[in-house]
A protein has these predicted regions:
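Domain-level signal for soluble alpha/beta catalytic cores
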Residues: 1-333
Length: 333
Protein backbone atom coordinates (compact mmCIF):
# COMPACT_ATOMS: atom_id res chain seq x y z
CA UNK A 1 0.00 0.00 0.00
CA UNK A 2 1.90 3.00 -1.32
CA UNK A 3 0.48 5.67 1.01
CA UNK A 4 0.72 3.71 4.28
CA UNK A 5 3.96 5.36 5.41
CA UNK A 6 2.52 8.83 4.81
CA UNK A 7 -0.61 7.82 6.72
CA UNK A 8 1.32 6.56 9.74
CA UNK A 9 3.59 9.61 9.72
CA UNK A 10 0.56 11.92 9.70
CA UNK A 11 -1.06 10.01 12.57
CA UNK A 12 2.09 10.37 14.66
CA UNK A 13 2.04 14.14 14.44
CA UNK A 14 -1.57 15.26 14.38
CA UNK A 15 -5.19 14.32 14.84
CA UNK A 16 -6.56 13.33 11.45
CA UNK A 17 -9.94 14.57 10.28
CA UNK A 18 -12.39 12.12 8.76
CA UNK A 19 -15.22 13.43 6.60
CA UNK A 20 -18.88 13.66 7.57
CA UNK A 21 -22.21 12.25 6.43
CA UNK A 22 -22.83 11.15 2.87
CA UNK A 23 -26.52 10.13 3.00
CA UNK A 24 -27.85 13.32 4.56
CA UNK A 25 -25.73 15.37 2.14
CA UNK A 26 -27.19 13.50 -0.85
CA UNK A 27 -30.72 14.25 0.41
CA UNK A 28 -30.08 17.97 -0.13
CA UNK A 29 -29.85 17.41 -3.89
CA UNK A 30 -33.50 16.23 -4.08
CA UNK A 31 -32.63 13.64 -6.71
CA UNK A 32 -35.41 11.92 -8.64
CA UNK A 33 -35.92 8.27 -9.53
CA UNK A 34 -34.69 9.17 -13.01
CA UNK A 35 -31.51 10.69 -11.56
CA UNK A 36 -30.78 7.47 -9.70
CA UNK A 37 -31.30 5.36 -12.82
CA UNK A 38 -28.97 7.46 -14.94
CA UNK A 39 -27.95 6.28 -18.39
CA UNK A 40 -26.59 2.84 -17.49
CA UNK A 41 -29.74 1.82 -15.59
CA UNK A 42 -32.27 3.80 -17.62
CA UNK A 43 -34.32 0.68 -18.39
CA UNK A 44 -33.83 -0.99 -14.99
CA UNK A 45 -37.10 -2.66 -14.06
CA UNK A 46 -36.93 -1.94 -10.32
CA UNK A 47 -37.20 1.28 -8.29
CA UNK A 48 -33.78 2.39 -7.04
CA UNK A 49 -34.34 5.80 -5.47
CA UNK A 50 -32.59 5.73 -2.12
CA UNK A 51 -29.81 3.43 -3.34
CA UNK A 52 -27.23 6.14 -2.74
CA UNK A 53 -24.25 3.95 -3.56
CA UNK A 54 -25.23 3.68 -7.22
CA UNK A 55 -24.87 7.45 -7.61
CA UNK A 56 -21.12 6.92 -7.95
CA UNK A 57 -22.01 5.47 -11.36
CA UNK A 58 -25.17 7.38 -12.33
CA UNK A 59 -24.49 10.80 -10.76
CA UNK A 60 -20.73 10.89 -10.11
CA UNK A 61 -20.69 14.69 -10.17
CA UNK A 62 -22.85 14.77 -7.02
CA UNK A 63 -20.59 12.40 -5.10
CA UNK A 64 -17.46 14.18 -6.33
CA UNK A 65 -18.85 17.53 -5.21
CA UNK A 66 -19.60 16.17 -1.72
CA UNK A 67 -16.09 14.70 -1.45
CA UNK A 68 -14.54 18.02 -2.44
CA UNK A 69 -16.67 19.98 0.02
CA UNK A 70 -15.30 17.81 2.82
CA UNK A 71 -11.73 18.12 1.55
CA UNK A 72 -12.14 21.89 1.35
CA UNK A 73 -13.41 21.83 4.94
CA UNK A 74 -10.16 20.19 6.09
CA UNK A 75 -10.77 16.45 5.90
CA UNK A 76 -7.63 14.31 5.76
CA UNK A 77 -9.59 11.12 5.06
CA UNK A 78 -12.69 10.80 2.90
CA UNK A 79 -14.88 7.73 2.78
CA UNK A 80 -16.03 6.08 -0.41
CA UNK A 81 -19.75 6.08 -1.19
CA UNK A 82 -19.99 2.32 -0.62
CA UNK A 83 -21.65 1.79 2.76
CA UNK A 84 -24.13 -0.71 1.27
CA UNK A 85 -22.11 -1.97 -1.70
CA UNK A 86 -22.16 -5.69 -0.96
CA UNK A 87 -24.11 -8.35 -2.83
CA UNK A 88 -26.10 -8.87 0.38
CA UNK A 89 -27.34 -5.27 0.68
CA UNK A 90 -27.65 -4.74 -3.09
CA UNK A 91 -30.02 -7.72 -3.35
CA UNK A 92 -32.78 -5.30 -2.27
CA UNK A 93 -32.37 -3.60 -5.64
CA UNK A 94 -31.52 -6.76 -7.64
CA UNK A 95 -28.09 -5.22 -8.30
CA UNK A 96 -25.78 -7.94 -6.98
CA UNK A 97 -23.99 -8.22 -10.34
CA UNK A 98 -22.85 -4.59 -10.20
CA UNK A 99 -21.10 -4.70 -6.82
CA UNK A 100 -17.55 -4.71 -8.17
CA UNK A 101 -18.30 -1.73 -10.41
CA UNK A 102 -19.99 0.19 -7.57
CA UNK A 103 -17.00 -0.17 -5.28
CA UNK A 104 -14.36 0.34 -7.95
CA UNK A 105 -15.94 3.50 -9.38
CA UNK A 106 -16.59 4.92 -5.91
CA UNK A 107 -12.97 4.40 -4.89
CA UNK A 108 -11.75 5.98 -8.13
CA UNK A 109 -13.90 9.06 -7.52
CA UNK A 110 -12.58 9.52 -3.99
CA UNK A 111 -9.00 8.82 -5.13
CA UNK A 112 -9.11 11.53 -7.79
CA UNK A 113 -10.52 14.09 -5.36
CA UNK A 114 -7.88 13.25 -2.75
CA UNK A 115 -5.03 13.35 -5.25
CA UNK A 116 -6.17 16.74 -6.55
CA UNK A 117 -6.13 18.21 -3.03
CA UNK A 118 -2.84 16.55 -2.10
CA UNK A 119 -1.28 18.09 -5.21
CA UNK A 120 -2.35 21.54 -3.97
CA UNK A 121 -0.83 21.03 -0.49
CA UNK A 122 1.69 18.15 -0.56
CA UNK A 123 2.48 18.67 3.14
CA UNK A 124 -1.11 17.61 3.94
CA UNK A 125 -1.71 14.32 2.10
CA UNK A 126 -5.30 13.13 1.80
CA UNK A 127 -6.36 9.50 2.10
CA UNK A 128 -9.22 7.35 0.82
CA UNK A 129 -11.05 5.08 3.27
CA UNK A 130 -13.09 2.34 1.63
CA UNK A 131 -16.39 2.30 3.53
CA UNK A 132 -17.59 -1.19 4.46
CA UNK A 133 -20.98 -1.17 6.19
CA UNK A 134 -22.57 -3.89 8.32
CA UNK A 135 -25.02 -5.15 5.63
CA UNK A 136 -28.72 -5.51 6.38
CA UNK A 137 -28.37 -8.99 7.87
CA UNK A 138 -26.89 -10.24 11.13
CA UNK A 139 -24.98 -13.44 11.74
CA UNK A 140 -25.52 -13.45 15.52
CA UNK A 141 -29.24 -12.80 15.88
CA UNK A 142 -32.38 -14.40 14.52
CA UNK A 143 -34.80 -12.12 12.63
CA UNK A 144 -37.60 -14.42 13.79
CA UNK A 145 -38.55 -14.19 17.49
CA UNK A 146 -40.33 -17.53 17.17
CA UNK A 147 -37.19 -19.27 15.92
CA UNK A 148 -34.19 -17.98 17.91
CA UNK A 149 -31.83 -20.49 16.31
CA UNK A 150 -32.50 -19.27 12.77
CA UNK A 151 -29.95 -17.08 10.96
CA UNK A 152 -30.64 -15.11 7.78
CA UNK A 153 -26.96 -15.23 6.74
CA UNK A 154 -23.90 -17.39 7.39
CA UNK A 155 -20.39 -16.29 8.29
CA UNK A 156 -19.07 -17.64 5.00
CA UNK A 157 -21.68 -15.80 2.94
CA UNK A 158 -20.67 -12.59 4.68
CA UNK A 159 -16.96 -13.31 4.19
CA UNK A 160 -17.44 -13.86 0.47
CA UNK A 161 -19.47 -10.66 0.03
CA UNK A 162 -17.05 -8.55 2.04
CA UNK A 163 -14.07 -9.94 0.15
CA UNK A 164 -15.54 -8.93 -3.19
CA UNK A 165 -16.22 -5.44 -1.86
CA UNK A 166 -12.78 -5.01 -0.30
CA UNK A 167 -10.94 -6.19 -3.43
CA UNK A 168 -12.81 -3.69 -5.61
CA UNK A 169 -12.16 -0.84 -3.17
CA UNK A 170 -8.45 -1.59 -3.18
CA UNK A 171 -8.37 -1.92 -6.96
CA UNK A 172 -10.02 1.51 -7.20
CA UNK A 173 -7.35 3.12 -5.02
CA UNK A 174 -8.44 2.98 -1.37
CA UNK A 175 -5.63 3.55 1.16
CA UNK A 176 -7.62 2.30 4.15
CA UNK A 177 -10.50 -0.10 4.68
CA UNK A 178 -13.04 1.15 7.22
CA UNK A 179 -15.32 -1.52 8.67
CA UNK A 180 -17.92 0.72 10.27
CA UNK A 181 -21.26 0.99 12.06
CA UNK A 182 -20.71 -2.49 13.50
CA UNK A 183 -23.78 -3.66 15.39
CA UNK A 184 -22.85 -7.36 15.23
CA UNK A 185 -19.21 -8.25 15.85
CA UNK A 186 -19.60 -11.56 14.02
CA UNK A 187 -20.40 -9.64 10.83
CA UNK A 188 -17.31 -7.52 11.42
CA UNK A 189 -15.18 -10.60 11.97
CA UNK A 190 -16.31 -11.92 8.59
CA UNK A 191 -15.17 -8.65 7.00
CA UNK A 192 -11.86 -8.72 8.85
CA UNK A 193 -11.32 -12.37 7.93
CA UNK A 194 -11.89 -11.45 4.28
CA UNK A 195 -9.43 -8.55 4.52
CA UNK A 196 -6.86 -10.86 6.06
CA UNK A 197 -7.31 -13.28 3.16
CA UNK A 198 -6.65 -10.47 0.69
CA UNK A 199 -3.55 -9.40 2.60
CA UNK A 200 -2.20 -12.93 2.38
CA UNK A 201 -3.07 -13.40 -1.27
CA UNK A 202 -1.69 -10.03 -2.38
CA UNK A 203 1.26 -9.92 0.00
CA UNK A 204 0.29 -6.51 1.39
CA UNK A 205 -0.69 -4.95 4.70
CA UNK A 206 -3.98 -3.06 4.52
CA UNK A 207 -4.51 -0.28 7.09
CA UNK A 208 -7.86 -1.23 8.62
CA UNK A 209 -10.12 0.89 10.80
CA UNK A 210 -12.83 -0.77 12.89
CA UNK A 211 -15.74 1.29 14.18
CA UNK A 212 -18.56 -0.10 16.29
CA UNK A 213 -21.97 1.29 17.14
CA UNK A 214 -23.30 1.58 20.68
CA UNK A 215 -26.99 1.50 19.92
CA UNK A 216 -28.49 3.23 22.97
CA UNK A 217 -28.08 4.12 26.64
CA UNK A 218 -27.60 0.43 27.49
CA UNK A 219 -23.98 0.94 26.43
CA UNK A 220 -24.00 -2.14 24.24
CA UNK A 221 -23.96 -3.03 20.57
CA UNK A 222 -27.10 -4.57 19.10
CA UNK A 223 -25.58 -8.03 19.56
CA UNK A 224 -25.09 -7.29 23.27
CA UNK A 225 -21.41 -6.41 23.68
CA UNK A 226 -20.10 -3.67 25.93
CA UNK A 227 -17.42 -1.33 24.57
CA UNK A 228 -14.73 -3.34 26.36
CA UNK A 229 -16.03 -6.66 25.04
CA UNK A 230 -16.14 -5.25 21.52
CA UNK A 231 -12.51 -4.16 21.84
CA UNK A 232 -11.41 -7.56 23.14
CA UNK A 233 -13.21 -9.30 20.26
CA UNK A 234 -10.97 -7.67 17.65
CA UNK A 235 -7.78 -7.03 19.63
CA UNK A 236 -5.98 -10.03 18.13
CA UNK A 237 -5.88 -8.24 14.78
CA UNK A 238 -3.41 -5.70 13.42
CA UNK A 239 -5.65 -2.62 13.18
CA UNK A 240 -4.93 0.97 12.27
CA UNK A 241 -7.62 2.12 14.72
CA UNK A 242 -10.67 1.16 16.72
CA UNK A 243 -13.55 3.37 17.73
CA UNK A 244 -17.24 4.17 17.47
CA UNK A 245 -19.63 5.90 15.12
CA UNK A 246 -23.32 6.58 14.49
CA UNK A 247 -26.38 6.07 16.75
CA UNK A 248 -25.24 8.55 19.41
CA UNK A 249 -24.13 12.16 19.51
CA UNK A 250 -20.63 13.22 20.52
CA UNK A 251 -21.41 13.74 24.21
CA UNK A 252 -23.01 10.31 24.61
CA UNK A 253 -19.90 8.60 23.18
CA UNK A 254 -17.49 9.92 25.82
CA UNK A 255 -17.84 7.08 28.39
CA UNK A 256 -17.28 4.42 25.73
CA UNK A 257 -14.15 6.09 24.40
CA UNK A 258 -12.94 6.42 27.99
CA UNK A 259 -13.64 2.72 28.54
CA UNK A 260 -11.43 1.52 25.70
CA UNK A 261 -8.67 4.17 25.74
CA UNK A 262 -6.64 2.73 28.66
CA UNK A 263 -7.00 -0.81 27.36
CA UNK A 264 -5.70 -0.62 23.81
CA UNK A 265 -2.53 0.12 21.89
CA UNK A 266 -4.62 0.83 18.79
CA UNK A 267 -5.30 4.38 17.71
CA UNK A 268 -8.83 5.52 18.52
CA UNK A 269 -11.36 7.03 16.13
CA UNK A 270 -14.82 8.52 16.55
CA UNK A 271 -17.35 9.86 14.09
CA UNK A 272 -20.56 10.56 16.02
CA UNK A 273 -23.85 11.86 14.70
CA UNK A 274 -24.75 15.55 14.89
CA UNK A 275 -26.62 14.87 18.11
CA UNK A 276 -29.82 12.85 18.16
CA UNK A 277 -32.50 13.19 15.47
CA UNK A 278 -35.59 15.28 16.14
CA UNK A 279 -39.19 14.09 15.71
CA UNK A 280 -38.83 14.46 11.93
CA UNK A 281 -35.59 12.46 11.74
CA UNK A 282 -33.51 15.58 11.15
CA UNK A 283 -30.38 16.68 12.97
CA UNK A 284 -30.42 20.11 14.60
CA UNK A 285 -26.99 20.22 16.23
CA UNK A 286 -24.91 23.09 14.87
CA UNK A 287 -21.22 22.79 13.94
CA UNK A 288 -20.35 24.90 16.98
CA UNK A 289 -22.31 22.62 19.32
CA UNK A 290 -20.68 19.50 17.88
CA UNK A 291 -17.20 21.00 18.16
CA UNK A 292 -17.82 22.04 21.77
CA UNK A 293 -18.66 18.44 22.67
CA UNK A 294 -15.74 17.00 20.69
CA UNK A 295 -13.44 19.35 22.60
CA UNK A 296 -13.89 17.05 25.60
CA UNK A 297 -12.35 14.18 23.59
CA UNK A 298 -9.36 16.34 22.78
CA UNK A 299 -8.94 17.77 26.27
CA UNK A 300 -8.88 14.22 27.66
CA UNK A 301 -6.47 12.95 25.00
CA UNK A 302 -8.86 10.26 23.80
CA UNK A 303 -8.62 10.52 20.05
CA UNK A 304 -6.44 10.10 16.94
CA UNK A 305 -9.06 10.34 14.17
CA UNK A 306 -12.23 12.41 14.42
CA UNK A 307 -15.08 12.97 11.98
CA UNK A 308 -18.85 12.92 11.70
CA UNK A 309 -21.67 10.55 10.88
CA UNK A 310 -25.40 11.18 10.29
CA UNK A 311 -26.41 14.83 10.05
CA UNK A 312 -22.88 16.23 9.90
CA UNK A 313 -21.95 18.57 7.07
CA UNK A 314 -18.79 20.17 5.67
CA UNK A 315 -19.42 23.00 8.15
CA UNK A 316 -19.28 20.50 11.03
CA UNK A 317 -16.05 19.04 9.66
CA UNK A 318 -14.49 22.49 9.28
CA UNK A 319 -15.32 23.23 12.92
CA UNK A 320 -13.62 19.98 13.97
CA UNK A 321 -10.62 20.64 11.73
CA UNK A 322 -10.14 24.13 13.17
CA UNK A 323 -10.46 22.77 16.71
CA UNK A 324 -8.12 19.79 16.31
CA UNK A 325 -5.23 21.92 15.02
CA UNK A 326 -4.46 22.99 18.58
CA UNK A 327 -4.21 19.45 19.99
CA UNK A 328 -1.78 16.55 19.87
CA UNK A 329 -3.06 13.07 19.00
CA UNK A 330 -3.68 10.48 21.67
CA UNK A 331 -0.54 8.52 22.49
CA UNK A 332 -0.85 4.75 22.20
CA UNK A 333 -0.64 2.89 25.50
Amino acid sequence: MKNTKQLNDALEHRILILDGAMGTMIQKYNLTEEDYHGEQFRDWAYPVKGNNDMLSITKPSVIDEIHRQYLEAGADIIETNTFSSTTIAMADYHMEDFVYQLNYESAKLARKACDDYTAKTPDKPRFVAGSIGPTNKTASLSPDVNDPGYRAITFDELRKAYKQQAEALLDGGADILLVETIFDTLNAKAALFAIDEIQEERGIRIPTMVSGTITDASGRTLSGQTAEAFLISVSHLDLLSIGFNCALGAKQLVPYLEAIAPQTHFRISAHPNAGLPNAFGQYDETPEQTAEQIKEYLDKGLINIIGGCCGTTPEHIKALSDLAKDYKPRKNT
